Amino acid sequence: MTKCKVIALANQKGGTAKTTTTLNLGIGLAHQGRKVLLVDADPQGDLTTALGWTNADSLPITLETQMKKILQDEPFVYNEGILHHEEGVDIIPTNIELSGMEISLVNAMSREQTLKLYLADLKKDYDYILIDCMPSLGMLTINALAAADSVIVPVQAHYLPLKGMTQLMKTIGKVQRHLNPNLKIDGVLLTLADMRTKLARTTEDSLRENYGKHIRIFKAIIPVAITAAESSAAGQSIYEYDKNGTVAKAYAEFTREVIQCGEKQRNKHESSLSR
């Protein structure tokens, strides 16, 4: 198995299709033969619910219980509590109890590294680990960025969400300087886009003009469609729910771009080591 790549999907702005993107990227990677673990790091538990586990509050083992054991220096089985979805991905589930972890982390030693410590042994079992971050820049998101090799930023195709990019980029920069110097930005993904509208086209132009010289703007654009929400409600990926639709095709294209991005980074790294 090749080296596992950990990707955080982050944006402090809600409503950017971040969870939908995590789910469909993960299952898209599984369709390409990759072993994938999804980490639901949002106390809302939307990723857990979207994969069909509507009883998250009654699950005995979640991300919160495992992180708590690390904080309290208690022994734990690293792969305990992981659930398997019929479309080929595994998930570390979450429920609202994770919200208390923000407070617990504030005064903890090595507080930014707790999630990284948890994922360390899991990495040997997977090609990709995708972390669905909460829509804030609190300690859980900092933990995700500290644990990740790279970050993908989903952005809604409206003007105002672009304004939040500045703060997110500052946070990523701080994490790179102080916690994770190897953290890379894989790119920005435009989501919920109706490219028939002037607003969406203007947003894309603005995104490419302001950030495109320094950051990859993925060629794939995820269109707005009711089928994306319906698939989550059905506990399925968009490929299973509407495999011939525009959203499924867009996510398949995005998945290919992510794989190509990873291969380029790996080849570049191996080339630098051989010099």
Where are the model-predicted features located?
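P-loop NTP-binding core
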Residues: 1-275
